[in-house]
């Protein structure tokens, strides 16, 4: 069980997974047996929107499209000849036993690369599959912030990974209330909560 008492969330993670430092996320874990399998938690800034419910982001479908767009931006490549295909596989609302509302979103992104980026004609630049990944996100709110646990796995292994790790980790993800001044008070005091 990973518990962050400062930011206010917890989730179960496989004990063999290792923490990756310096990833830019609140926390990042990777499966050492398959480095393409990983998870991280991202939290909205307290100085941005105040979220009272995950529904503040939109419907599950609208939220899935926003996450897909953001994920594609994060995966932007500066290499020539890169093409990405993406789709929303699933977007649904889930209410836990305590009445907390979550969104469960599953995306699939394929990346194609040209082996000869400088070819003169399209025939000289054939696209080959570089990678194919499935992304699962569980979003919830607490403390006026939006929390996202995002996990990824190679698509061909997703169903196996989903049963072994992703569902258990996702369903265990829970933001909780922390004892911290609201963002408006923190700003008045000159504090920066990130």
Language-model-derived ranges and their functions:
Residues 8-22, 169-177:
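Short conserved aromatic/hydrophobic patches within beta-strands of well-structured domains
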Residues 7, 19-148, 153-157, 179-194:
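Conserved polar/disulfide-associated segments of primarily extracytoplasmic proteins
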Residues 13, 63-64, 68, 162-169:
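Stable alpha-helical elements in mature extracytoplasmic
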Residues 154-175:
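A short, hydrophobic/aromatic-rich structural module that often spans a beta strand
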Residues 1-10, 73-76, 161-164:
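Short aromatic-glycine motifs in intrinsically disordered, low-complexity regions
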Residues 2, 147, 172-176:
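Generic low-polarity alpha-helical segments
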